[in-house]
A protein has these predicted regions:
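General "foldedness" signal
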Residues: 51-55, 125-126, 131, 150, ...
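Propeptide-to-catalytic entry region of secreted or membrane-anchored zinc metalloproteases
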Residues: 1-37, 41-45, 207-214, 218-238
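Active-site-proximal segment of zinc-dependent metalloprotease catalytic domains
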Residues: 22-122
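Acidic-enriched, low-complexity/disordered segments with a strong bias for Aspartate over Glutamate
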Residues: 9, 14, 21, 32, ...
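Extracellular low-complexity, Gly/Ser/Thr-rich intrinsically disordered linkers
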Residues: 163-238
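The catalytic-center signature of Zn2+-dependent metalloproteases
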Residues: 89-193
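Detector for Asparagine
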Residues: 22, 34, 38, 73-76, ...
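Charged, glycine/proline-rich intrinsically disordered loops and linkers
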Residues: 6-20, 53-85, 139-171
Length: 238
């Protein structure tokens, strides 16, 4: 592991553009992904979502056909090397939010994506539908859009003490109430726990996925490799 300081012409960088650039320009900055997890820190270009400022973004892993994991990117290549990449397979963190109260939580969350975990809240085509979309049965799901609307109301109608108390609560898809503690949720919550199903997904990625720093990928033989750039799907998560 190490730290490398890179001088760039841009002060702010659009994280979506950086992570999806397939020209090879940013891929040239990578250390070997089969030996390191690359984490870039730079100031994200201005822009907010319904959840506020983007704190981090990560690429989502691949799994080969013979070890496909539902919800990941399928690839025909069981082994992929740095020379095959044209985009910067990595994690990006927003340096504007690089203070301790956020950075550790953000890095943990993005590492979860990097190792195959999805958000615990409902993600589908319709905001009105609440579904379990993270492929983990032991993580309660909830409608985040409903939560954000309620928090907007609570901010103007509850006392500060009441607001702090309710913001860590979620209402699950089946109507149950629970405290948010999972790393793969967004603020607000404790965000310091994984579940058994999430652990199983991460272990599957560590055992089978290319571009992960594991003993499997450190022992790649020349006969297993594809020469030159590969056209790979680029999927990012925040």
């Amino acid at each position: 592991p190490g730290v490398e300081y890179l001088q760039r012409d841009e002060y702010e960088i659009d994280c979506e553009v950086f992570m999806t650039d397939n020209s090879g320009k940013y891929a040239a900055l990578l250390w070997d992904p089969n030996r390191y997890i690359n984490v870039f820190m730079y100031q994200f270009a201005s822009g907010e979502t319904a959840d506020g400022v983007t704190l981090g973004i990560s690429h989502f892993p691949y799994t080969p056909i013979d070890a496909y994991l539902e919800g990941t990117n399928l690839t025909n290549y069981p082994y992929i090397t740095l020379s095959n990449l044209m985009y910067p397979y990595s994690i990006s963190l927003n340096s504007k939010c690089a203070y301790e109260s956020y950075i550790l939580m953000t890095l943990s969350h993005e590492l979860g994506h990097y190792l195959g975990l999805r958000h615990v809240f409902s993600e589908g085509d319709s905001e009105s539908v609440c579904i379990d979309s993270d492929y983990c049965e032991d993580t309660p799901s909830y409608n985040r859009e409903d939560y954000l609307r309620y928090m907007a109301w609570a901010g103007g109608n509850l006392s500060p003490e009441e607001y702090v108390a309710v913001r860590i609560l979620r209402e699950g898809c089946s109507g149950e109430q629970f405290v948010s503690v999972n790393v793969m949720d967004y603020n607000y919550g404790d965000q310091n726990r994984f579940t058994a199903d999430q652990r199983s997904r991460v272990r599957h990625i560590l055992r089978n996925s290319p571009l992960i720093p594991t003993e499997r990928n450190a022992r790649i033989q020349r006969s297993m490799l594809h020469d030159g750039p590969i056209d790979l799907p680029i999927v990012t998560m925040k």
